[in-house]
Regions:
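Conserved GNAT-fold acetyl-CoA-binding loop/helix
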Residues: 36-59
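A short hydrophobic/aromatic micro-motif that marks alpha-helical segments and, especially, helix-coil
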Residues: 48-50, 63, 168, 183
Length: 186
């Protein structure tokens, strides 16, 4: 299977989605280091700027290479050049099934940026990558992520009870799915 590729840059009505680089590490660290962003997204807060740089230089590209994942995007509000969040595919379940994930700085919550960014990536993935299905997981307490999934037309497929989150707390793990055939009628 050839490497999944996406354009370096996408634009939506209010956002620019672009590949993240080490030059973005400081912007990314400002939100990835926040517990209210990191824990609901399933990872511990990034401790140092150096840790974020290492992630961008090594962990992210190695994961993408190993799982044949497209690079994904940083979320930039038009008129700025600052990355305030990310949207990407973080896991390949099968050749034609990817899992989408997203994060956003709390200063930008409640403005509809994540659904707008995810919609652009989902549309591109179904059209250009030939995916059959896109999956999304979130913890039961993450009401914002649940709303994003529902707004984008995902169907709740499973509730896995009493899983541990990134802090070791017991909570439900919700699994959503969106088929290409469902996306085509939206």
């Amino acid at each position: 299977m050839s490497r999944a590729e996406l354009p370096e840059r996408l634009e939506t009505e209010r956002l620019v989605l672009r590949v993240r680089t080490v030059a973005d590490a400081e912007d990314i660290h400002t939100y990835a280091s926040l517990p209210e962003v990191a824990y609901p997204a399933g990872f511990p807060p990034v401790k140092t700027l150096e840790d974020e740089i290492y992630y961008l230089e090594h962990i992210l590209p190695e994961r993408n290479q190993k799982e044949n994942l497209p690079a994904g995007y940083g979320i930039v509000v038009k008129g700025t050049d600052k990355i305030v969040g990310s949207v990407d595919f973080n896991h390949r379940h099968e050749d034609d099934v990817l899992e989408i994930g997203y994060t956003l700085h709390p200063d930008y919550w409640g403005r509809g940026y994540v659904p707008e960014a995810a919609l652009a990536l989902i549309d591109l993935a179904f059209k250009d990558l030939g995916l059959h299905k896109i999956e999304l997981t979130c913890f039961g307490y993450n009401l914002q992520s649940k709303r994003v999934a529902e707004k984008l037309g995902f169907t709740l497929e499973a509730r896995i009870r009493d899983r541990k989150d990134a802090q070791g707390n017991r909570c439900d793990d919700l699994r959503y799915g969106l088929l290409r055939s469902e996306w085509e009628v939206i």
